[in-house]
A protein has these predicted regions:
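Sec-dependent N-terminal signal peptides
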Residues: 4-14
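Bacterial Sec-dependent signal peptides at the C-terminal "C-region" and cleavage site
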Residues: 15-19
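Subset of outer-membrane beta-barrel
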Residues: 20-275
């Protein structure tokens, strides 16, 4: 009985607060900057906006983990692999949200290419798997993501991203449609060491979310980051450090209603291919 009550409670919490977590932001860098992601060029673009990995030139492997509100049932895991080739960049990714009796899983294959500094495009194909518990049939769906980025100047980048534009349907009793997510934003290098970012996200299941983030490179390999976003009202901060070929990022965020979440991520730079 207690197990069933816990399951029902978590399901209601997930649907009301997160409205599915299929397009959740991966990587502590973005998490620390108010969940900003759409105009960044980094490893976790493979999850957040595939266009951002178009210029990524290092074979890399990464993992991230988020503990939300000190509840293991709301854990969020990400893993990804990025492979640059002569004609673009490929990426593989996996994410999982939830726990044994309820979890959302996303498997992705991405490709991005820079046609010029002014046009970078990325496409990602997703296979979605939902596990409710042993008493229910697993639910599956397929969708895709598109990203565009443009470096207007050496200091200014504009990004656009859309998840699930065809409003994929999950075959259940009520034929639930998964949300469409659209992001638009820009990043601006105020100086070579200081980055300012802003972004708006539309989710067909929620109100608009406005995001603002700052990143400061205090030392050669050390970064400090802060950010806020509005839905729900959340403040965040974090730090990042590059140790040889390993990038270590940690962050924390405070939601006004539900409390503190922590995220950490590791990126391993394996090799720079001869392209």
């Amino acid at each position: 009985m207690k197990r069933n009550l816990l399951l029902i409670g978590v399901l209601l919490f997930c649907n009301q607060c997160f409205s599915w977590d299929l397009s959740g932001i991966a990587g502590s860098r973005s998490n620390a900057m108010g969940n900003f992601s759409v105009a960044l060029h980094d490893f976790w673009s493979v999850q957040n906006d595939p266009a951002g990995m178009a210029d990524f030139r290092t074979i890399s492997l990464g993992f991230s983990y988020e503990n939300r509100f000190f509840m293991k049932e709301l854990s969020y895991y990400n893993g990804a692999f990025v492979l640059p080739v002569n004609f673009g960049t490929f990426g593989l990714s996996f994410s999982r949200f939830g726990f044994e009796n309820y979890n959302e899983n996303k498997f992705g294959l991405a490709f991005a290419r820079a046609f010029s500094p002014y046009l970078k495009m990325g496409l990602k194909l997703d296979y979605l798997l939902f596990n409710f518990n042993d008493d229910y049939e697993k639910k599956k769906a397929a969708t895709f993501e598109l990203g565009l980025q443009s470096d207007i100047t050496d200091n200014l980048c504009i990004g656009v991203y859309i998840f699930n534009p065809h409003h994929a349907k999950l075959k259940t009793l009520h034929n639930i449609r998964l949300p469409v997510v659209f992001r638009f934003g820009l990043s601006y290098k105020v100086t070579k060491d200081f980055l300012a970012c802003t972004e708006a996200e539309y989710n067909s299941d929620k109100s608009l979310d406005y995001r603002f983030g700052l990143e400061y490179n205090t030392l050669k390999e050390f970064y400090i980051r802060v950010g806020v976003h509005t839905n729900p009202a959340t403040a965040s901060f974090g730090v990042g450090y590059t140790l040889h070929r390993v990038i270590i990022d940690v962050s924390a965020s405070m939601d006004q209603h539900t409390g503190v979440s922590f995220q950490s991520s590791l990126i391993f730079k394996i090799k720079e291919p001869n392209l």
